[in-house]
Amino acid sequence: MAKLRSATTTEGRKRAGARALWRATGMTDSDFGKPIIAVVNSFTQFVPGHVHLNQLSELMGETITAAGGVPKEFNTIAIDDGIAMGHGGMLYSLPSRDLIADSVEYMVNGHCADAMICISNCDKITPGMMLAALRLNIPVIFVSGGPMEAGKTKLANIDIKLDLVDAMVKGADESVSDADSDQVERSACPTCGSCSGMFTANSMNCLLEAIGLALPGNGTTLATHKDRKQLYVEAGARIVDLCREYYQKDNQEVLPRAIANKTAFMNAMVVDIAMGGSSNTVLHLLAAAQEAGVDFDMSHIDALSRKTPFLCKVAPATPEYHIEDVHRAGGMMAIVRELGKAGLVDMSVNHVAGSTMAELVKKWDATDPTNEAARKFYRAGPAGIRTTKAMSQECRWDEGDNDREHGCIRSVEHAFRQDGGLAVLSGNLAVDGCVVKSAGVVDDMLHFEGTAVVYESQDDSVEGILNDEVKAGDVVVIRYEGPKGGPGMQEMLYPTSYLKSKGLAEKCALITDGRFSGGTSGLSIGHVSPEAASGGAIAYVENGDKIIIDIATREITLALSDAELEARKQKQLARGKQAYKPLDRQRYVSSALKAYALLATSADKGAVRDLAKLEELS
């Protein structure tokens, strides 16, 4: 039987001081000996996806207490990528993932907590907590704050659904009137919750269901809906059960590394590809696999992408469907079910819910006419009322979406596309690979040949696009924005949004060693590895070079001979200490960001810390 970690601070006469401090937090004699559950919250008033998370604390605490645990809450930081977008604030977004992971480790190990409930929601917070959970390897359940309702308004007498990206595109489109732009802005983000499309936050919260660390409905039940209360209650009770399983029965199969094993990572990636998840998920799953000690890299993702169909097309790939529609169609359990029918995922894996994936999928099958609980659950829908209050409405669709031929979630036979929504490309421009969200690429752009227009920073690219330097047929190349070169690997949502506003989204490509928001669509290729700052070939591209992109063959090619590439390499090396650094870029880089850059690896490694370099320095 494993001993409670918290016994280190609660047992024996020599721990009188620690117990005295615990008593000052409200603990009593009856609490000592119970599992201490760290309620890892991320409430902040800066982020709509987190603005309501303080409303969950009391509920979670009451549930854990009733189940026989002792809840102790602390908070992490949370950066809103949408607000940090397009200025120096975005440099801090990806580095915050590691800071969050470290802060969770510090708090949990510093106080010897026995288990964790991770209340996350947005882009880097869920991955950061996931890294910590796999690093610590103690019982854990993730519960997100839930997705935002899709925005809705009427323009030109047409009812339309909206999200954050629409506000950005309309705001940059000079042909849109001030009144229409203002109307879209005011309608795009109507409630608390993570932004309403298949963007990074929702992608990660959905994948936690698929990898087995979050309960069904975690990724798709709206933040405003009362059904989330039951999700939180079940999670609070279940985490105490997991503590009993591990600490009293020595059942190590309930630990996160046992659940999120290689098979589970492969399952999650298949689901990710099938649902057209954000390309950032590749970055985060690679990083999480390293923390879990799982052999999972770009080659696995490439192989899976070639055989996984695209089953769920959601904004930003289409304006027709948002996350609320995915829930109506049966959520992640429905996608897993369709993939399972085709033998594309392993249904025997375990789950924090206490069953195999096969059992869980059957339990939550909303297509079963006799399964009233599942059918009701997946009909939870939006209320259309502006609010920041969680669990405040109980509207339901009149009926679910079980149309697997024409609906939001398709069967394999009726897939939107037989190759999936994410693809890994490689070639002389990206020897270690790069990633494209192919779900957002129109068929006419799956093969593209264009002329390079090179920028040394995102800021310069935005200025160039808005000043009409980019024309149809061009390939915008933005470099020195990788993990080390940025530093911080900024998202390029503004450049892609401005290409849309200029009518070039389906006429140009964009390539970067940075990354993209989950809200990006179009032929947007990121995570180019090695990055420019690490000597990658993207550093050698010059204006006017021909670049060939072929998603079907998974190739990306800079049309230069090996001899010319070598000549350009020597030209770069001749710059001495300035080699592989941007020309004339004016950017303040703080000591915190310099520390991040010192250990950052390229995107193909998940942009994690270079542990070999860390060992050299220690």
UniProtKB/Swiss-Prot annotation:
Q: What class of enzyme is it?
A: lyase
One Pfam family from the UniProt entry?
ILVD_EDD_N
Q: Which residues form the active site?
A: 517 (proton acceptor)
Tell me where in this chain the PTM N6-carboxylysine is found.
Answer: 124
Gene3D superfamilies from the xrefs? Answer: IlvD/EDD C-terminal domain-like (3.50.30.80)
Task: Give the superkingdom in one word.
Answer: Bacteria
Pathway the protein takes part in:
Amino-acid biosynthesis; L-isoleucine biosynthesis; L-isoleucine from 2-oxobutanoate: step 3/4; Amino-acid biosynthesis; L-valine biosynthesis; L-valine from pyruvate: step 3/4
What positions does the entry give for Mg(2+) binding?
Answer: 81, 123-124, 491
The subunit structure is: Homodimer.
What is the official name of this protein in its record?
Dihydroxy-acid dehydratase 1
Naturally occurring in which organism (per UniProt): Pseudoalteromonas translucida (strain TAC 125)
